[in-house]
Design a protein with these regions (language model features):
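Mixed-charge intrinsically disordered linker/loop segments at interdomain junctions
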Residues: 1-3
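Histidine- and acidic-residue-rich, metal-dependent catalytic cores
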Residues: 5-245
Length: 245
């Protein structure tokens, strides 16, 4: 693993001017994955009339974001397949509700929403007992790392907002800004539900798959103050379809 290089590179990118993001991202991809992407200036892309060039840039970004998500999976054997599970659940939930959230922005946010956890010591993000005020403050800062990176990359404002808000809750007691439920962007509401579902599945991993799914969906439905109520039924419909197949 090249986790130290990844963290160092992300810290540099989070403070870099927008004009240097592309080169920094390409260098980081090569360092972490060994893949050498083609670097395209975003300023140049903005001047090109070819839609293919712009689409290529988006595809390159998504591949980079996905590589970071897969790197996060390596922190625990229990995380294997997590990225694809979250991606499928969130996109299916969005689609069954009529796709109100841009799928590309949602995909980017799903890949990066927990990237900031890489910056936290395991003593914080794996802690089971009550956290100290300092530990809680450290945990509550983690959405800002990936959101800050996305905000500095042209074209990812929507994803940045989703990442920043995915731990906000319907009752206004979430973090980092304690937003009221009506202030939370739609993509963040979806991510909050699928992320919680995955966490409960992980917690009950020793049970059979069917039992774990039922326990997870029961816990999600019981948390009516945590999640946006309008997204519970679409999510339930996705889970029903998953169980039927």
């Amino acid at each position: 693993l090249k986790l130290a290089a990844l963290v160092e590179g992300l810290e540099r990118m989070s403070n870099a001017p927008q004009s240097e993001i592309d080169l920094g991202a390409a260098q980081l991809i090569k360092t972490v994955t060994g893949f050498q992407p083609q670097v395209t200036s975003r300023a140049l892309v903005g001047k090109l009339s070819s839609k293919g060039a712009a689409k290529g840039s988006v595809a390159d970004d998504l591949r980079f974001f996905r590589s970071l998500a897969l790197q996060f999976e390596t922190r625990s054997a229990l995380f294997a397949g997590r990225t694809d599970r979250l991606h499928q659940l969130a996109l299916d939930t969005n689609r069954i509700a009529g796709s109100p959230v841009d799928e590309v922005q949602l995909e980017a946010a799903l890949y990066l929403h927990d990237l900031g956890m890489m910056f936290l010591p395991e003593s914080v993000w794996l802690k089971l007992e009550k956290m100290s005020k300092v530990e809680r403050a450290v945990l509550h800062a983690h959405p800002g790392f990936a959101a800050g990176l996305l905000e500095r990359m042209e074209g990812w404002k929507g994803a940045a907002e989703m990442v920043q808000q995915h731990h906000e809750t319907w009752d206004g007691k979430g973090y980092p800004a304690k937003l009221d439920g009506t202030e939370i962007c739609t993509g963040a509401k979806i991510i909050a539900i699928v992320d919680a579902f995955e966490a409960v599945m992980l917690k009950h991993g020793a049970r059979s798959h069917g039992s774990s799914v039922l326990r997870a969906i029961a816990e999600v439905n019981a948390c009516d103050k945590q999640f946006a109520p309008e997204w519970i039924e679409p999510f339930n419909a996705v889970i029903r379809t998953m169980l039927e197949h």
